[in-house]
From Swiss-Prot:
PANTHER family: CYTOCHROME B6-F COMPLEX SUBUNIT 6
Protein name stated in the entry: Cytochrome b6-f complex subunit 6
Subunit structure: The 4 large subunits of the cytochrome b6-f complex are cytochrome b6, subunit IV (17 kDa polypeptide, PetD), cytochrome f and the Rieske protein, while the 4 small subunits are PetG, PetL, PetM and PetN. The complex functions as a dimer.
Keyword entries, A-Z: Chloroplast, Electron transport, Membrane, Photosynthesis, Plastid, Thylakoid, Transmembrane, Transmembrane helix, Transport
Any one of the GO BP annotations: photosynthesis
Organism, as annotated: Morus indica (Mulberry)
Family statement drawn from the similarity comment of this UniProt entry: Belongs to the PetL family.
Transmembrane stretches, start-end: 4-24
Membrane topology (UniProt): Single-pass membrane protein
GO molecular function: electron transporter, transferring electrons within cytochrome b6/f complex of photosystem II activity
Cross-referenced InterPro entries: Cyt_b6/f_cplx_su6 (IPR007802)
Major localization class: plastid
Lineage of the species this protein comes from: Eukaryota, Viridiplantae, Streptophyta, Embryophyta, Tracheophyta
SUPFAM superfamilies to which the protein is assigned, alphabetical: PetL subunit of the cytochrome b6f complex (SSF103436)
Keyword Transmembrane: yes
Amino acid sequence: MSTITSYFGFLLAALTITSAIFIGLNKIRLI
């Protein structure tokens, strides 16, 4: 159970970082 929770947390963090970088790149392109 602990492994699944840690894996889900890691996946959520990776998704958040990826989306943040993607949004940042889009803002740079608009400027």
